[in-house]
From Swiss-Prot:
This is Probable cell division protein WhiA. Involved in cell division and chromosome segregation. It comes from Mycolicibacterium gilvum (strain PYR-GCK). Gene3D superfamilies: Homing endonucleases. One of its GO terms (biological process) is cell division. The keyword Membrane does not apply. GO terms for molecular function: DNA binding. Residues 304-327 are annotated as: Disordered. The keyword DNA-binding applies. It comes from the Bacteria. Belongs to the WhiA family. Residues 275-308 bind DNA.
Length: 327
């Protein structure tokens, strides 16, 4: 089951005892998933959701809290509708329900944001408002670089009201318009986890956090592997460059090179990929890596001085781009 469906399934099964919170959830769900329609001169309240369990929860809450009967219509997937949708409709008592849930104000005008009683309600009401909004039009992506908890909103006023509700819960959410659609987005991983718990999806939060941690561990392992690979490549290039310079140094100095420096240089050329420590062990008698490095350094310095005096290419001339590219 996708993360969004997991959250919605868990929220739909959540038992809420507070009447105020249940009313806030219904009001928010109707606001974000529904609309008011005039049919034969009467106000009809409709809410379209993507899971049958959400539709049944809404129908039950409307009856338990307000005493009005709602009908659930199933819209099967066909044509441009990719999945089955469920429409909860209250026709007979639509206007009364709209007024009581705050979809209409006292003058009978549609409310653009969230109802005042929800905006000014308790923290539990703010949690319920988010729960209703997510059940209506929420989505949660898999943990990763672009992970997000997002709610599509019916307008900018509703989006700002939802941002305010998140702020009351200690969560930073942002309202933005994407391709003409108003959305509220939470991107921070810790904030997403906190909001899931606040809404009542603790089990899904644990699953999401586990996947998030696994992904972070994999990403860290990949970074370390890449880091090790890069270090190996740098070391290989440095060894090849050093061997090429030493080879050129031996050419420049010819028979004038001191025996102990020639021995160190010959080892470097013969074992191009070996570390200084390994070269020291191969020497006869064995030397420390510092002793090997010192002798090679003196060999290069002596060769570069002679090259300058003779006006010929120095040891650096042996290190060509093609040489490093092949390393």
């Amino acid at each position: 089951m996708a993360m969004t469906a997991e959250v919605k399934d868990e929220l739909s099964r959540l038992v809420v005892n507070s009447v105020s919170a249940r009313r806030a959830e219904v009001a928010s769900l109707l606001r974000f998933a529904g609309g008011l329609h005039i049919v034969s001169g009467r106000v009809v309240v409709e809410a379209e959701v993507d899971l049958g369990i959400i539709a049944r929860r809404l129908r039950k809450d409307i009856y338990d809290l307000y005493g009005y009967s709602a009908v659930v219509h199933v819209l099967s997937a066909s044509g441009i509708r990719k999945s089955t949708r469920y429409v909860v409709r209250v026709a007979k008592d639509g206007e009364a329900l709209a007024r009581q849930t705050g979809l209409l104000d006292l003058r009978g005008r549609p409310v653009r944001g969230l109802p005042a009683q929800v905006v000014g309600g308790s923290v539990a009401d703010a949690e319920a408002a988010w729960r209703g909004a997510f059940l209506a039009h929420g989505s949660l992506t898999e943990p990763g670089r672009s992970s997000a908890l997002e709610v599509s909103c019916p307008g900018p006023e509703a989006a700002l009201a939802l941002v305010g509700a998140a702020r009351r819960l200690g969560v930073s959410a942002k309202a933005r318009e994407v391709r003409g659609s108003d959305r509220v987005v939470v991107r921070d991983g810790e904030a997403i986890g906190a909001l899931l718990t606040r809404m009542g999806a603790q089990d899904t939060r644990l699953t999401w956090e586990e996947r998030r941690m696994r992904r972070e561990v994999r990403a860290t392992a990949n970074r370390l592997a890449n880091f090790d690979d890069a270090n190996l490549r740098r070391s290989a290039r440095a060894a090849v460059a050093a061997a090429a310079r030493v080879e050129r140094a031996l050419e420049i100095l010819g028979d004038t090179v001191p025996d102990h420096l020639a021995a160190a240089g010959t080892l470097r050329v013969a074992h191009r990929q070996a570390s200084l420590e390994e070269l020291g062990r191969l020497a006869d008698p064995p030397m420390t890596k510092d002793a090997v490095a010192g002798r090679i350094r003196r060999l290069l310095s002596m060769a570069d001085r002679k090259a300058k005096q003779d006006g010929i290419p120095d040891t650096e001339s042996a290190v060509t781009p093609d040489l490093l590219e092949d390393a």
